[in-house]
Amino acid sequence: MALYTMKELLQDAQEKKYGVGFFNTFNTDMVRAVIRAAEECSSPVIIGTAEVLLKYGSFDMIAPVMLEAARRAKVPVAVHLDHGYSYEVIMQALRWGFGSVMYDGTREKDHADNVRNSAQLARTCHAMGVGLECELGSVGGLADDAGKVDQMAYTDPNDARSFIEQTGADFLAVSIGTQHGVYKATPKLDLNRLAEIHAAVDVPLVLHGGSGLSDDDFRNTIAGGIRKVNVYTDIILAAKAAIHADGEEAYADALLRAQDAMKEATAVKLRLFGSAGRA
């Protein structure tokens, strides 16, 4: 099947009001698990990797794996760069032919710098036919190279409107109470804020920090306008549990068990997001 773009997948989700899962990967087993799940569910899906995950393998190793797997898939698959902080990594994704990239400017000290950099990257991406995701506010929970963890800052609906107008970003990641990684307490999502953001902008909204949310949280956020749902930690935890289930088995068998567990965890999310049966 031809390679799809995230813009194509989210446009359909926007029109039909469902969510498309994005799953971060950093090796072949993860890529295979996600695509197996998507094919099993007859669901569109987005795969990709994040700049912070490149410590587990070089971009030039994982990028061709994702792209080739997407082309061979029996369902629509888009390939996306998640949380690109540096110009160099974003340019690598563009060079490899990713259909979309995320620029995360939330670590910029000045909001104006985030706006300026996002607008510049939007012009570059659009000239190449690539979609750009940006984040406004801060979901929090990610650590930088020095180990400092980002703190959460909610997205302001008025700021969201002006940000999209000034930058031309195609997708907006919003902060409404989620956080990356494992939650230490039950998250409290600000659904009223989400509704206000959804009314303020006309681009697909993205939910980061999806792992650990309840089924109702997912249903409510998708009903409130979320069209792309990012998942990573839940998939990793499924693989970890599978590997630890039998410490005596061979390494290769443990990898297969982990892949099956990730596939099942992914399939659960695809059905929950409402994308199953839409391929």
Spans of model-derived segments:
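Alpha/beta enzyme core
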Residues: 4-16, 27-53, 60-76, 84-200, ...
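Glycine-rich beta-strand-to-loop/alpha-helix junction loops that act as flexible
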Residues: 208-211
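Extended, intrinsically disordered, low-complexity segments
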Residues: 243-279
